[in-house]
Amino acid sequence: MRTCHRASHRDVSPEEWGTVNARRAVVIGGGPAGLLAAAALAPAVAEVVVLDHDELPEAPAHRRGVPQSRHAHLLMPGGMAVMEELLPGADLRGRLVAAGARETALSSDLLALAPTGWFRRWRHRTFVTMTASRPLLEWGVRRAVLDTNPRVTVRRARVSGLRGSARRVTGVRLAGADGGPPEDLDADWVVDASGRGTRLLPWLDVLGVHGIRERHVDSGLANATRVYRVPPGAPDWPMTLVQADPWSGRPGRSGMIVPIEDGRWMVSLGGMRGSEPPKDPDAFLAYALNLPSPLVGRLIEAAEPLGGVHVSRSTSNSRRYLEDARLWPERLVAIGDAAATFNPIYGQGMSAAALGARALAQAVRQHGIEAPGLARRVQRTVARAARGAWTAAVSTDVLYPGVEGGRPTLGDRLAAAYSRRLNHAATGSYTAACALWDVTTLRTPPARLFHPDALLHALTGSPLPALSGPPLTAAERDFLSGLKPWV
């Protein structure tokens, strides 16, 4: 097995460990969820070994093991706040901005057409969201974790199973390299952060843990993404979003322009089952021009493409109700997509994973890593942390025709009617918009939507008339009026 990264080559002295005994934690998966879990465990153990089947690059680069690697990614303010809490002194935000990541204040820097109309741009600069390519975000988190946690190392290895019993996990089994024999790696703690492709349930079956309930809700979303060079004269063009309409009874269609590093736009088109975006470049442009607003299409028609169109259909919502298992092994926790996976169109996966890692860190700090029942307690807390993102994604996706795995209940329809009223109010009310952004950016649980101020605006509607078009600045209008197709 090759060591791909090491945070530091110096030894960690027993004095630095404090009361830590010589014990090892193993984290399966080297993405943001896994690295943040490693940071959560590092203060309580002598060594954290992060295992990933990919060779993790030294610089930002796409890798095969990340199905959404070439599509748009947002790091919500709720997720960023949690990551910085988990990584004190790492200056994650500063690292990412220095590497070229962009920051967008949803309140003032976003052009967004909702099904209920155009959102206004307010003078308040709040709900700052970071946008960058997935490779840059992942690299930034990885370097921040490794540079500030000398007990964490990363190895390239493929995990083929768990070791232990239904009562306690004692390590992992690694597939043999180059056809060689398998290797057993002892561990006092194991965290599964292996993502959408997790094999956790079959591994638990082998240990004697059976009957874990799963739910899958698939709207059939296909994501098509192409990267463009930002046209001259538009270096600060705001993030632009045309949202899908879940209330129309027709397959949803959406488009977004996300500013990313190196003077580029990442343009993602989304279509639910029956309205999937195409891979052909000419058809990709035509699809964008035929969205409810042609703004995304007009902008990319004038931009230089920097590659082909990448399509992904790995977009379903999946949840494993691990917290309800009748029997749960000590010293095993699953976080991130290994526990609950969300439709990536909502941009909440990375932030939800951070919330799960924080739940692990808080539990270890409060109860001690050897506390009986700690793994089950953490798993239940992880489930609560993911509930908001799951509810938001699934309650919307079940409204689309052709959805698999669920149909809207009466409660879903009532929630949809309320959501539509609140969205309409948010087009003309900063207070109502803040309620939506609080929830969609994972700063607060969904109950925030039913606070008195949000309820009042949902009942009374928008206090301002609907906008007839996107709220552009004078400079943006001049740029748009002078657009010419790129050749």
What spans do the regions from the language model cover?
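Extreme N-terminal leader/targeting segments of oxidoreductases
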Residues: 1-25, 43-45, 55-56, 483
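C-terminal helical "tail/cap" subdomain of flavin- and related membrane-associated enzymes
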Residues: 7, 361-487
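N-terminal Rossmann-like FAD-binding beta1-loop-alpha1 element of flavoenzymes
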Residues: 22-51
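Glycine-rich FAD pyrophosphate-binding loop
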Residues: 42-67
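Generic enzyme active-site microenvironment
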Residues: 50-51, 190, 335
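Active-site-adjacent segment of FAD-dependent monooxygenases/related oxidoreductases
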Residues: 70-140, 225
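Predominantly flavin-linked oxidoreductase catalytic cores and closely associated redox partners
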Residues: 148-287
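FAD/FMN-dependent oxidoreductases across multiple families
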Residues: 261, 275-389
